[in-house]
Amino acid sequence: MAVTKKPDLSDPQLRAKLAKGMGHNYYGEPAWPNDIFYMFPVVIFGTFAGVIGLAVLDPAAIGEPANPFATPLEILPEWYFYPVFQLLRTVPNKLLGVLLMAAVPAGLITVPFIKIYNKFQNPFRRPVATTVFLVGTVAAIWLGIGAALPIDISLTLGLF
């Protein structure tokens, strides 16, 4: 804020220019070319310098080298695939597991069409859609946590 020139709104000439809609060319700092040729490169180079500095000063621990001849006992997917992995792991019929996975996006597609009143509707006035969303979110979190646990306690999370 200290770099830009603030307009003096008590100046009658400036007020007359502003009333005509021509004040933006006569005060302040123009965005072109000052921001494009000065501020953007400073921000970009500063970001690169910060990332490279962090990479050099605090490199991430890679861990032990991979051994292609020793497979781990249980291979876990990335965290965002945990709910789907838990479905496939606990459902006895694999075809049913695949159908359940296909039912998730199909169900999500149908949620906006349940009791539509207008496109700016309050979610508290759409109890069915809100309930489907909340139950689906809780189920996804429950399955995701269960996927990281052993199979015998994965559905109950060891709580029951």
Swiss-Prot record:
Q: Please name the Gene3D superfamilies in this protein's record.
A: plastocyanin oxidoreductase (1.10.287.980), Single helix bin (1.20.5.510)
Q: InterPro entries given for it?
A: Cyt_b/b6_C, Cyt_b/b6_C_sf, Cyt_b6/f_cplx_suIV, Cytochrome_b_C_euk/bac
GO MF term set: electron transporter, transferring electrons within cytochrome b6/f complex of photosystem II activity; electron transporter, transferring electrons within the cyclic electron transport pathway of photosynthesis activity; oxidoreductase activity
Could you say which protein family the record assigns here?
Belongs to the cytochrome b family. PetD subfamily.
Which HAMAP family does this entry report, sorted A to Z?
Cytb6_f_subIV
Q: What does this protein do?
A: Component of the cytochrome b6-f complex, which mediates electron transfer between photosystem II (PSII) and photosystem I (PSI), cyclic electron flow around PSI, and state transitions.
Task: Specify the protein name.
Answer: Cytochrome b6-f complex subunit 4
Q: What organism is recorded for this protein?
A: Auxenochlorella protothecoides
The gene designation is petD
